[in-house]
Amino acid sequence: MNDCLDLESYDNIVICPSNPFLSIDPIIKIQELNDFLLKHKERVYVVSPIVANNSLKGPTAKIMQSLNIDVNVLSVAKHYREVASNIVIDSSDKHYIQNIQSLEINCLVSEHLVMRSDNDKVNLANDILKFLNA
């Protein structure tokens, strides 16, 4: 990894709501990063790219279907459970909280996961900061 990147200096890691299969997995499979995430998964927060059983953007839902994976936030939590202990989900997916918590993953709920404006993006960022500082 980059010598200038000191992973230990970060209090938390946030995995943004991007495609887990095409965008995130290739990055978190880098050995040094993967080892760090496995060791410090309590400091890792995933923002779900799935809301109300659909992709926020892009082909995530289609890829999940092609892999015979249920398109929901529970599947996202299962996908990341080895490297993350926290997931941010949309309020429309609150009915999954108990199932997600049974995976020993903290579930944080935001009203702002669907970002249609810059203001929505700022609100989501503020929600995540509140979760990180709780």
Question: Model-derived features: where do they sit?
Answer:
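Short, conserved loop/helix-junction motifs that constitute active-site signature segments
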Residues: 35-41, 81-83
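Short, flexible loop segments at boundaries between secondary-structure elements
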Residues: 40-57, 112-116
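Short acidic, glycine-rich surface-loop motifs adjacent to enzyme active sites
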Residues: 9-23
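Active-site glycine-rich loop that binds ribose-phosphate moieties when present
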Residues: 1-7
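Short glycine-rich anion-binding loops that position phosphate/pyrophosphate groups of nucleotides
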Residues: 18-22, 52, 93
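Structural motif
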Residues: 11-14, 43, 86
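Charged helix-capping and loop-helix junction motifs
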Residues: 26-35
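C-terminal functional extensions of proteins
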Residues: 57-134
